[in-house]
From Swiss-Prot:
Its cofactor is (R)-lipoate. It catalyses: N(6)-[(R)-dihydrolipoyl]-L-lysyl-[protein] + succinyl-CoA = N(6)-[(R)-S(8)-succinyldihydrolipoyl]-L-lysyl-[protein] + CoA. It comes from Arabidopsis thaliana (Mouse-ear cress). Pathway: Amino-acid degradation; L-lysine degradation via saccharopine pathway; glutaryl-CoA from L-lysine: step 6/6. Belongs to the 2-oxoacid dehydrogenase family. Residues 1-85 form a transit peptide. Binds 1 lipoyl cofactor covalently. This is Dihydrolipoyllysine-residue succinyltransferase component of 2-oxoglutarate dehydrogenase complex 2, mitochondrial.
C-alpha cells in the first residue's frame, strides 16, 4: 500500500514511472552510502531493546526538495542516536563511587578535581567524597577525556553511583560535545521573546503596588531593625561538613545515652619528664622516633585498665561486654575536624612501638589519608588537650566506649614535698565515665593507678 501511494505521489508530480525508478534507485544508493550516516560501513542500525532496525529502506527521490530536507533530518537524528549507542560499545567508561567501608553507606561529593574536557590518566583522582570519617578519592577507571559529570558538588552519593563519563578517545568526545551544545542554542533563541513578553506583565503588577509602599507601617519596622543590620552583614553562613555533622551527632548521642560523670586528679610529671630528658637521644638513635609523654600515659592507661577491667567494658542491652584486649583510641584534632584513630593491641606494645604508631596515625589524620579501618573499634580513649594549652576539661565519651582519659597542660605549681614547698610540674587529669556501668570507686582507683605509674614509671618494670 505504501509503495502504491509513493507511485501515485510521484506520478502527480509529473514524473514518469521510469524516472521514479531511477530516482528510487539513486535514493537507494544514497541511503547505502556513508554520506547519510557518518561512521557506518554499510548502513545505520538503531538498537531498541533486543531489536535492530535498518534504515536502508528509506528511499527518497532526489528531485524533491521537501523529501531531501526529510532525509537530512533523518541523517542528523540517526547521528545523535548512534553516538550514545557507540558509547555503550566501549568508546566511553563511567567513573563510579567506590566502596567506602562496611559502616559507611553514603557520602557527600565535596569537590571536583578536574573539569569537563580535561584529559585524565588511569587511576587519577577526578573528585573527592567526604564521609562521616574520611575523605575518599574517585579515580578514573581509564585514560581519556572527561565528557561530563553526572552529579553536582554537595550531592549525596552512594557506592556505585555514576559520577562521570570519560571518553577513551578524543574523537568520540569531539563528536558528543557539539550534539550537546545544539539543544542549548535552540533553547536559548525562543527564550528572549518570551522573556520580553513577560517583562511588561511583571512591571505592571508592581506599578499598582507602588502607591501602597510609602504607607506608615514600613518606616517604624525598618527603624527598629536598623541596629541589627550591621552584625548580620558581618556574619558568614557555611554549611557543615560531613565530618562535623557526624562528630556533632555522636557527641550529642553520647550525652543523651550515657550517665556522664567526671572525676579529677593531679599528677606530678617530674619523674616522667626526667626519664624523657635522660634517654631521649639514645631512644631516637635506636628507634628513629622521638620519645614523648603520650607513650607514658598510654602505658599508664593500659595498666589502669588491667587493674580495673570494668572501665574497658561496655553495656550492650541488658548485658555487659568485658573486653580482654586493649585498643586505645587517641583523639587527633585536624583542620577538618576531630578524628580518633586506634592503637590496636596497645597492651602488647613497648614505648617505641607506641610512639611510632602515634606518629603514623597523626600524620595520616592531618593529611586526610587515614583509612576507615584505622579508626574503627577502640575500647578506651586518651585525649590530650594540653597540646592546645587546656588547663582542665571534662571530655565526652566516644561511643561505644565507656570512659575517656583527658590530659592537660603541664604547669609549674608550688607543692609540699617532704614538708617543704617546692615547685613541681603538675598536670590535671580527668576521667569521664558512664556511671551506669562504672562506680565512683572504680573511677577513682583507675585515676590513682594512672597517677602512680606516671609519677614512678619504674612500676612498669617491676609490674607493681
Amino acid at each position: 500500500m505504501m509503495m502504491r501511494a509513493v507511485i501515485r505521489r510521484a506520478a502527480s508530480n509529473g514524473s514518469s514511472p521510469s524516472l521514479f525508478a531511477k530516482s528510487l534507485q539513486s535514493s537507494r544508493v544514497a541511503a547505502s552510502s556513508p554520506s547519510l550516516l557518518s561512521g557506518s560501513e554499510t548502513g545505520a542500525y538503531l538498537h531498541r531493546g533486543n531489536h535492530a532496525h535498518s534504515f536502508h529502506n528509506l528511499a527518497l527521490p532526489a528531485g524533491n526538495s521537501g523529501i531531501s530536507r526529510s532525509a537530512s533530518l533523518v541523517s542528523s537524528t540517526l547521528q545523535r542516536w548512534v553516538r550514545p549507542f557507540s558509547a555503550e560499545t566501549g568508546d566511553t567508561v563511567e567513573a563510579v563511587v567506590p566502596h567506602m567501608g562496611e559502616s559507611i553507606t553514603d557520602g557527600t561529593l565535596a569537590t571536583f578535581l578536574k573539569k569537563p574536557g580535561e584529559r585524565v590518566q588511569a587511576d587519577e583522582a577526578i573528585a573527592q567524597i567526604e564521609t562521616d570519617k574520611v575523605t575518599i578519592d574517585i579515580a578514573s577507571p581509564a585514560s581519556g577525556v572527561i565528557q561530563e559529570f553526572l552529579v553536582n558538588e554537595g550531592d549525596t552519593v552512594e557506592p556505585g553511583t555514576k559520577v562521570a563519563i570519560i571518553s577513551k578517545s578524543e574523537d568520540t568526545a569531539s563528536q558528543v560535545t557539539p550534539s550537546q551544545k545544539i539543544p542549548e542554542t535552540t533553547d536559548t533563541k525562543p527564550s528572549p521573546p518570551a522573556e520580553d513578553k513577560q517583562k511588561p506583565r511583571v512591571e505592571s503588577a508592581p506599578v499598582a503596588e507602588k502607591p501602597k509602599a510609602p504607607s506608615s507601617p514600613p518606616p517604624p519596622k525598618q527603624s527598629a531593625k536598623e541596629p541589627q543590620l550591621p552584625p548580620k552583614e558581618r556574619e558568614r553562613r557555611v554549611p557543615m561538613t560531613r565530618l562535623r555533622k557526624r562528630v556533632a551527632t555522636r557527641l550529642k548521642d553520647s550525652q543523651n545515652t550515657f550517665a556522664l560523670l567526671t572525676t579529677f586528679n593531679e599528677v606530678d610529671m617530674t619523674n616522667l619528664m626526667k626519664l624523657r630528658s635522660q634517654y631521649k637521644d639514645a631512644f631516637y638513635e635506636k628507634h628513629g622516633v622521638k620519645l614523648g609523654l603520650m607513650s607514658g600515659f598510654i602505658k599508664a592507661a593500659v595498666s589502669a585498665l588491667q587493674h580495673q577491667p570494668v572501665v574497658n567494658a561496655v553495656i550492650d542491652g541488658d548485658d555487659i561486654i568485658y573486653r580482654d584486649y586493649v585498643d586505645i583510641s587517641i583523639a587527633v584534632g585536624t583542620s577538618k575536624g576531630l578524628v580518633v584513630p586506634v592503637i590496636r593491641g596497645a597492651d602488647k606494645m613497648n614505648f617505641a612501638e607506641i610512639e611510632k604508631t602515634i606518629n603514623s596515625l597523626a600524620k595520616k589524620a592531618n593529611e586526610g589519608t587515614i583509612s576507615i579501618d584505622e579508626m574503627a573499634g577502640g575500647s578506651f580513649t586518651v585525649s590530650n588537650g594540653g597540646v592546645y594549652g587546656s588547663l582542665i576539661s571534662t571530655p565526652i565519651i566516644n561511643p561505644p566506649q565507656s570512659a575517656i582519659l583527658g590530659m592537660h597542660s603541664i604547669v609549674s605549681r608550688p607543692m609540699v614535698v617532704g614538708g617543704s614547698v617546692v615547685p613541681r610540674p603538675m598536670m590535671y587529669v580527668a576521667l569521664t565515665y558512664d556511671h551506669r556501668l562504672i562506680d565512683g570507686r572504680e573511677a577513682v582507683y583507675f585515676l590513682r593507678r594512672v597517677k602512680d605509674v606516671v609519677e614512678d614509671p619504674q612500676r612498669l618494670l617491676l609490674d607493681i
